[in-house]
Amino acid sequence: MTVSSSPWALMALFLMVSSTMVMAIPPRKAIDVPFGRNYVPTWAFDHQKQFNGGSELQLILDKYTGTGFQSKGSYLFGHFSMHIKLPAGDTAGVVTAFYLSSTNNEHDEIDFEFLGNRTGQPAILQTNVFTGGKGNREQRIYLWFDPSKAYHTYSILWNMYQIVFFVDNIPIRTFKNAKDLGVRFPFNQPMKLYSSLWNADDWATRGGLEKTNWANAPFVASYKGFHIDGCQASVEAKYCATQGRMWWDQKEFRDLDAEQWRRLKWVRMKWTIYNYCTDRTRFPVMPAECKRDRDA
């Protein structure tokens, strides 16, 4: 796919057209809170900096180590959001991740992974979903903005019916509950939220051909928001005590509406560079869950 030389103009046109239509129902508005309300550092504490009373956090990667943090609680379903500004400049080999994951061998996982690139080349956003330890469900898109220039909002809506990935309230991917088709769906393993910044130059950029240029270090990823609105559960819990009664379980959040599907189609047509659902070399038979992905 060829990236437009004027993504800002395309985005302005898209938003102008959207404003003339009935707007989709987004998830509940995220509530920004300090880092320490919901999260704790997990490794390389000296490579993290907090500002403004913990309302902003920086993760720092150098040639010695990356760093990361995780949520205090574990959750079954909810809405999870973060404002992130990615490292700038030549970031080939550098990965910034924001994801949910359980901890056992047959784990569930819902991933945002931002793959760095050479200066002048667009960063790539990879999403993936693991169920029962099975992943290999990668989708990759170019973003329609420079994610290192300002904060943008990356969100996950997870309920019994679907998982939706949002960028600035625009849906970029859905993963539908296809249990009736024999596909496992994350519904009984509480997950923590994690974020990390690390060197992955063995695979992240052009399959590992582009290596991290440490002359450009340190690499800094910045965070704000730290929003969690989920059903908190113990790691041993198999169901959410409020299952079926929370706002994310209601009818309007069980599927995308027409406007959201239109926006998702725009992402597919203009910005998608890889979708495992359409990779017949890798998957000669379409994976069963892709039958629920109406835009595949």
UniProtKB/Swiss-Prot annotation:
Its EC number is 2.4.1.207. Contains at least one intrachain disulfide bond essential for its enzymatic activity. N-glycosylated; not essential for its enzymatic activity. The active site is at residues 109, 113. It is found in: Secreted, Cell wall; Secreted, Extracellular space, Apoplast. InterPro entries: Beta-glucanase/XTH (IPR044791), Beta_glucanase (IPR008264), ConA-like_dom_sf (IPR013320), GH16 (IPR000757), GH16_AS (IPR008263), XET_C (IPR010713), XTH (IPR016455). Induction: By auxin and brassinolide. One of its GO terms (molecular function) is xyloglucan:xyloglucosyl transferase activity. Belongs to the glycosyl hydrolase 16 family. XTH group 1 subfamily. This is Xyloglucan endotransglucosylase/hydrolase protein 4. It comes from Arabidopsis thaliana. The gene is XTH4.
